[in-house]
Amino acid sequence: MDLLSDIEKQLQKATAQAFLIALSGGLDSTVLLSLFAKLCQKQPHLQILSLRAIHIHHGLSPNADSWAKHCQDLCDQFQIPLIIERVQVDKTNGIEAGAREARYQAIKKHLQTQEMLVTAHHLNDQTETFFLALKRGSGLQGLGAMQQQSVLFGMQILRPLLGFTRPQLEDYAQKEKLNWITDESNKDNRFDRNFLRNEILPELRARWAYFDLAVQRSAQHCFEQQQLINDLLSEAFAEHCQIKNQFKLCQFRKYSLAKQTALLRMWLAENQLEMPSKRQLTQLINDVVFAKEEANPQFQLVNKIIRRYQDRLYLTKPFSDLTKYCLKLEQNTLSLPDDLGNLSVQENEHNLIFHWQDFSVTLEKTDLPISIRFGYSGKVKHHPKRPREDIKKIWQELGVPPWERNRIPLIFYGNELKSAVGFFRVFDEY
């Protein structure tokens, strides 16, 4: 089957009718753009309601500006709207990883609701991805490599060229007289993917003509086996993960290590996090899951923190220390630190009504200065019929995790605590 007919059949089964093409300007994405431009001419048969392209300008090559211009000229030729997005690449974890992260985050910013991202990954890319996963010691999920349709970083992705080899794309490009750019970094074998592409895989293909197809079959077997494991564990997973960013530990410690790691991987995948290594998962289980009952353990995984409280794991972002903040409330709205949103106040004849997120509290008016603080130690009277109690005990009764307690806005009249917004107000003693 030829490229055009195959992609046409794929689009008839696709779950979207609006598409955003990832366009680098290289051979693969240029062929992809040409194919979609041709398919658009078959309207209304395919019902492609929207077609756009996006080019990510990484700024890593001296030729980056000319590549962006080439992509613009190409899209003008095909009459397809193009977005050019410049990004800054964080090289902390390597250029390849940083560029990939920056690229997908930039694309996610522009991807519209009901729009599907289309990438030009082909069969040779699939082989490289499989070998890179093998090099990392990946399990079934990693060795499953890429699927024709999947979700990545919360985006629906279609890879319609996955069944075709690069030579097949080259044949199409030559017949259509397409022009494309060549990234000079593709020859740099310091990068793992280039080393495989330029040095290792050509030798294997020379010996075994159908090597890429065999790798694709193995990847598909791995993917299907992982799906089977997920299906078999789905009932247990639903019991442990009833809230997306929480994981109940009841009965969990009785499972085998293999079942524990599989369920935790499912939880992390549910939250769209990159898979940790086996060593990291074992450390998470030993240091957090099996930590002493009175401990408040935590484990950092990339840009997230896994914490434990009342026999549950919680997935949170790293939080700033807010205990030194003292914010004067001098207007009707106050912007709170560390992405906590705004606190606002309304006034009626006798009271002030404070609003924060979905919470509110009504307090009597005052002539004292009003401030918002975070974190408090000492005793408070939070119920009219109960004595003053240590605030730590109150937080425990309310089921507020330790890391959240210093993130709840506390309203002070002068130096007197009046309320923890959304949780309790302080009553006077008589």
UniProtKB/Swiss-Prot annotation:
Report the EC number(s), separated by commas if there are several: 6.3.4.19
The yes or no answer to whether the keyword Ligase is present is yes
Catalytic activity reported: cytidine(34) in tRNA(Ile2) + L-lysine + ATP = lysidine(34) in tRNA(Ile2) + AMP + diphosphate + H(+)
> SUPFAM superfamilies of this UniProt entry?
Adenine nucleotide alpha hydrolases-like (SSF52402), MesJ substrate recognition domain-like (SSF82829), PheT/TilS domain (SSF56037)
Which CDD domains would you find in this protein's record? TilS_N
Q: Which InterPro entries match?
A: Lysidine-tRNA-synth_C (IPR012796), Rossmann-like_a/b/a_fold (IPR014729), TilS/TtcA_N (IPR011063), tRNA_Ile_lys_synt (IPR012094), tRNA_Ile_lys_synt_N (IPR012795), tRNA_Ile_lys_synt_subst-bd (IPR015262)
Sample GO molecular function, one term: ATP binding
**Keywords, in A-Z order:** ATP-binding, Cytoplasm, Ligase, Nucleotide-binding, tRNA processing
**PANTHER family for the chain:** TRNA(ILE)-LYSIDINE SYNTHASE-RELATED (PTHR43033:SF1)
- Function noted in UniProt: Ligates lysine onto the cytidine present at position 34 of the AUA codon-specific tRNA(Ile) that contains the anticodon CAU, in an ATP-dependent manner. Cytidine is converted to lysidine, thus changing the amino acid specificity of the tRNA from methionine to isoleucine.
Q: What is this protein called?
A: tRNA(Ile)-lysidine synthase
